[in-house]
């Protein structure tokens, strides 16, 4: 079932009025990989009428008013990625293309889309509450360093003048908000909901206070301190309120929602998604973003890898939940009935596929402890369950109509090597790899890897050797390729040349999978970039801020110039 995008579609459903209207910076793709589709179907499954306005023209009222006034609230998201990341390259150049837009052309979403859409709604529907959500809002919920303007900005809740902000995976919080507003009509009563950020005129009586907006604007060290506190205390099982003064008000973060149970996750992903671009937007052109996920399966939600540059820790916390085998097999059966299904499940996974079935008795009862699960090495308390993941893949392959099953999402090779006999899983993984297994060592220099909170590169080499040796014995031409980041805090020319030499010596090919580090809001790496400090050790960190030098670092590793760069 497609959710309505026009009045005509509402009439066909017999809906005279909508309870909730969701506004997004992406095209409307009715697939569980897209946030508005998940939230929209979840609300509908609980009896609410929901419509979607995708990529509205922000220069006119035509699009934002086409579904009328919602009974309860507008929900606003910039889309699956931060709008500034969507609109600009790592060299701050305007992108000409957008994979989330029909036809692939850029310019269909505004910069700082969450703020722009909220202001547009407030202009034409000033009395209707606006609730923010999605990655952009979640990662900008407190005062944050904004690389594009090169300054610290206030909470996006304050800047946008929205009523509430939902952070993390928002199904439960948005449902509670809808239920409270349906009963009372009072947005103030929604400020007790877990997973919500709100503002207060008075300082909260309890909780953890972060350094204020003024403090972190004037002192980058305070920014590092704020990020550390936010990281440690944002945990559903610690149940701690966090707040930050901004001007004369306080931005208040309630404790996160508890992760969805397996039963809740199962029900969510089996809602009646069309797994297609909505016809209203499909007629405008192809949406490239659906092509890689259309016949994929989300088996895992969350990641406890805690990589410094990754937004997941701040967005979803470190808690991992996973679906039951029965639920996943039922979704595969649904996919096999699609007219354009060719027999291949392109991916079974999530942020990190081989965390499926893993558990930690401490994290799942008391919250994240004062150490990282996989750094500097795999914690002994974390229990992998690769057998269960392999059993799942084997069961999928036996379903009529399925010819191939692939694992294309992240694999933590250090987690595999922590097993007593890693080859048991690696041998099976060879069967489910589509030619090349993509791993993310990210760098080679020990200092940079330590700041990234990534395992030693020697583990990548060990895994690569095991995988390719087993593949050869099995008569399979399958290989491991690496993804790398340059320009990350801690990298100068010495470290960059070290990475170049490593690739030349150990990989034997010129890699194309090289990214320039982008300081996106809310991550540990961005705190390092702005403050010049490791937030968790207080040690000084070298930061390369010159766009010209950062681009040269990429060229150096891509072997576009002969010889090594001088340091």
UniProtKB/Swiss-Prot annotation:
Disulfide bonds: none
Entries under Pfam families matching the protein: DUF3362, Radical_SAM, Radical_SAM_N
CDD domains, per database record: Radical_SAM
Annotated TM spans: none
Keyword Plastid belongs to the record: no
UniProt xrefs under Gene3D superfamilies: tm_1862 like domain
Alphabetical list of SUPFAM superfamilies matching this protein: Radical SAM enzymes (SSF102114)
Cofactor(s) the protein requires to work: [4Fe-4S] cluster
Cofactor: how bound: Binds 1 [4Fe-4S] cluster. The cluster is coordinated with 3 cysteines and an exchangeable S-adenosyl-L-methionine.
Residue intervals of the Radical SAM core domain: 288-560
Residues at which [4Fe-4S] cluster binds: 303, 307, 310
Keyword Protein transport: no
Record GO terms (molecular function): 4 iron, 4 sulfur cluster binding; catalytic activity; iron ion binding
Keyword tags: 4Fe-4S, Iron, Iron-sulfur, Metal-binding, S-adenosyl-L-methionine
HAMAP family: UPF0313
Similarity-based family: Belongs to the UPF0313 family.
Protein name per the record: UPF0313 protein CTN_0332
């Amino acid at each position: 079932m497609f959710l309505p995008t026009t009045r005509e579609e509402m009439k066909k459903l017999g809906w005279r009025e909508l309870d909730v209207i969701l506004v997004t910076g992406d095209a409307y793709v009715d697939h569980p990989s897209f946030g508005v589709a998940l939230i929209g179907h979840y609300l509908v499954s609980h009896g609410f009428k929901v419509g979607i306005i995708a990529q509205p023209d922000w220069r006119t009222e035509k699009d934002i008013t086409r579904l009328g006034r919602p009974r309860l609230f507008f929900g606003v998201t910039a889309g699956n990625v931060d709008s500034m990341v969507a609109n600009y390259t790592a060299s701050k150049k305007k992108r000409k293309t957008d994979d989330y837009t029909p036809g692939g052309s850029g310019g269909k979403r505004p910069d700082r889309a969450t703020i722009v859409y909220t202001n547009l709604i407030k202009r034409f529907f000033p009395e209707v509450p606006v609730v923010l959500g999605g990655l952009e809002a979640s990662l900008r919920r407190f005062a944050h360093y904004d690389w594009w303007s090169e300054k610290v900005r206030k909470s996006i809740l304050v800047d946008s003048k929205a009523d509430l902000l939902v952070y993390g995976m928002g199904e439960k919080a948005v449902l509670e908000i809808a239920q409270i507003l349906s009963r009372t009509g009072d947005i103030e009563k929604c400020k007790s909901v877990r997973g919500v950020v709100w503002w207060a005129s008075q300082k909260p009586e309890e909780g953890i206070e972060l350094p204020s907006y003024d403090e972190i604007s004037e002192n980058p060290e305070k920014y590092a301190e704020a990020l550390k506190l936010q990281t440690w205390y944002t945990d559903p099982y610690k149940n701690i309120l966090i707040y930050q003064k901004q001007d004369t008000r306080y931005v208040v973060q309630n404790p996160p929602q508890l992760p969805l149970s397996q039963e809740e996750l199962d029900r969510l992903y089996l809602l009646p998604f069309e797994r297609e671009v909505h016809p209203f937007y499909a007629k405008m052109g192809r949406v490239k973003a659906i092509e890689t996920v259309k016949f994929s399966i989300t088996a895992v939600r969350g990641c406890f890898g805690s990589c410094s540059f990754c937004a997941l820790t701040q967005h979803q916390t470190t808690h991992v939940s996973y679906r039951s085998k029965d639920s996943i097999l039922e979704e595969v059966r649904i996919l096999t009935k699609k007219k354009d299904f060719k027999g291949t499940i392109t991916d079974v996974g999530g942020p990190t596929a081989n965390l499926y079935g893993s558990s930690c008795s401490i994290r799942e009862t008391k919250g994240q402890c004062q150490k990282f699960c996989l750094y500097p090495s795999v914690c002994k308390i974390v229990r992998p369950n690769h057998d269960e993941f392999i059993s799942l893949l084997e069961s999928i392959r036996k379903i009529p109509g399925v010819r191939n099953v692939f694992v294309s999402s992240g694999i933590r090779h250090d987690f595999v090597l922590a097993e007593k006999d890693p080859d048991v899983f690696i041998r099976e993984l060879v069967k489910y790899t589509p030619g090349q297994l993509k791993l993310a060592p990210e760098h080679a220099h020990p200092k940079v890897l330590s700041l990234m909170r990534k395992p030693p590169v020697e583990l990548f080499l060990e895994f690569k050797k095991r995988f390719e040796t087993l593949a050869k014995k099995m008569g399979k031409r399958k290989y491991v390729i690496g993804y790398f980041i340059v320009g990350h805090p801690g990298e100068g020319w010495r470290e960059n040349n070290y990475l170049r030499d490593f690739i030349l010596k150990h990989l034997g090919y010129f890699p194309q999978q090289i990214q320039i580090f982008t300081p996106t809001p809310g991550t540990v790496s961005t705190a390092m970039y702005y403050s010049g400090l490791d937030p968790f050790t207080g040690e000084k960190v070298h930061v390369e801020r010159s766009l010209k030098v950062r681009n040269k670092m990429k060229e150096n590793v891509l072997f576009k110039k002969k010889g090594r760069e001088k340091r």
